[in-house]
Amino acid sequence: MIYRIFGRFLPVFAGVLGIVLGLAAFSSTLSADQHGGATTEHGKWIEAVKATGVFFSARYRFEHVDDKGFTKNANAHTIQTHLGYKSDIHYGVSGLIELENVEAIGSGDYNSTTNGRTNFPTVADPENSEINRVHLSYHNIPDTVVTVGRQRLVLDNARFVGDVGFRQNQQTFDALTVANSSLPDLGLAYVYVKQILRIFGDDN
C-alpha cells in the first residue's frame, strides 16, 4: 500500500534521509570528541535516529453535497496520507521532507475538479501524489528562523494566507520565510513566495 502510493518518491525520500542521518551522526561524533566522550559506531547511529524523526499520518474524510442544480448527489470518500522525516538541528540547520497522497475510496461519485465527473456536484479533493513539503531552516541568528523551500504558511487564522487544512490536498508554498520573535508579544515575518501549490493538485 505504502509503495503503491509513494513509490515514485521513495528514492528521493531515501536520499534525503541518508544525507540527514549522515550529518546527524557526524555531528554527534564531533560533539562527543569535543567533550572527551567516546561513542561507538552503533551508538552514533542510534543517537542520530533518536534526535530525528520519521512521521506518518492518515485522515479519512467524507463529504456529501446535495445541490439542487444536479440530478445526483455527491458522496466523496477520500483518505489523505502523509509520510515525512524531520531532522533535529545540526550546525544550526534543520530539514524536513514530507510526501502527501490523496486517494478516492469507492466509486468516486463526485466532481473532484480533475476526474471529469461533471454530472456530480464539486468536492475539491482530487486524487494526487506530491512532495508536499521539503525545506531547510537556519537557526543560528538570535530569535530568528530562516526557512527556504516548500513549506506550510498559516498566518493568524488563515483567512488570507493558509494551508486550506479542511481540504485533503494541503496548500503549500515555495517560499523564503524569515520569522523573528525578539519583541515581546509580537512576531515579525518576511515571506517571499515564488509559487503556490494549490489544493487542486498537479493536474489543475
Regions inferred by a protein language model and the residue ranges of each:
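Cleavable N-terminal export/targeting peptides
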Residues: 1-40, 44
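Transmembrane beta-strand segments that form the barrel wall of outer-membrane beta-barrel proteins
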Residues: 58-62, 148-153, 159-163, 188-195
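Outer-membrane beta-barrel translocator domains and adjoining extracellular loop/strand segments
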Residues: 66-72, 108-113, 157-166, 198-204
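Signature for the C-terminal beta-barrel architecture of outer-membrane proteins
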Residues: 31-38, 142-146, 165-204
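Short acidic, glycine/Ser/Thr-rich loop/turn "cap" segments at secondary-structure junctions
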Residues: 116-121, 156-164, 171-173
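Intrinsically disordered, low-complexity segments enriched in small/polar residues
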Residues: 1, 83, 188-190
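Intrinsically disordered, low-complexity regions
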Residues: 8, 16-19, 23, 37-38, ...
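Beta-barrel outer-membrane channel/assembly domains of diderm bacteria
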Residues: 28-153, 176-181
